[in-house]
Each structure stands twice: as C-alpha cells, then as structure tokens.
C-alpha cells in the first residue's frame, strides 16, 4: 500500500511539522559551506591525497543529476514509487557530495581558476549561479520531500516545479565547475 493510500484510508495519519528540521539543516549546511570557504585548509593532513575529493564531488553530482532525471521521467509517467526511489537516491548522493565537499574545503585551500578571457567569464557565471542556487536548493528539496511525506500532494507539486529544475541545474553545474577547474588542482 502506498503512503497516499495509507493516509487516505487511515484517519490516524498525522501530518508532521518538518519546518524546524528544514531550517536547522539549511542553516547548518549553508553555514558550514560559508565557514569552510573562508578557511585556509588544514595543514599536515597526510592520510590520503585530498585532490581526489573534487573528482568524488563531480561523480556524486553526476549521479544526483541522473537520479533526478530518472525521477522526473518516472513522475511524468505517473510512477510515484519509482519516482520516490530515485529522489531518495538523489538525496543519498547529494549527502555524499556534501560530506566530500566539506571534507575537501576543510582539508585543502581553495583552488583559484587559472583561465582567462571568455572562459573565465563563463566559469564565473556558472560558479556564481551554482553557488547561489545550491544555497537555495537545500530548503527547497527538504520542503518538497516534507510535503510529499505529509501527503500535501498539490503543495508538493507546486514547489517541485521549482525544486526539480534548480536541483538539476545545481548538480549539472557542479560537474561543469569541476571539469573547468580540474586542470588547476
């Protein structure tokens, strides 16, 4: 039985208030990213080569992008169960991305982009839009899932119309940023 059927048939189903959780997670994630962006990087870390972390970030972002596309296709075909599974997979790879992203920025200094001219303009446009939308996607994605869990289907659809394209853009541009800056690591 799907959650939707369960909620419709069960009068004891109660909506939960996920707003405090969403606010706290958004503040913690975005706060960590901002804090670590200004740090010089941990010195004397020799357990492994931290240069592998940006590649891992790109791999996790690639999987997130593919999972989101699959989730979008599934929901367009009205296959809610498959859609839900791909969304959960996207959350898992996004979480893994965040872990490796935070680790990378804690363990190493920022790498400046070495390109110039039009490529530098393109790089910085992609990077800036990626950063801004990455901060916005955290509460959007969490709110979308919370509304789905609470069976607020119409509200879920409304916010998902914003969440899905932004999350797709963020995951794709994360890979593009890596491809463009990787020669300078």
UniProtKB/Swiss-Prot annotation:
Pfam families: DUF420 (PF04238). It comes from the Bacteria. InterPro entries: DUF420. This is Uncharacterized protein BpOF4_00895.
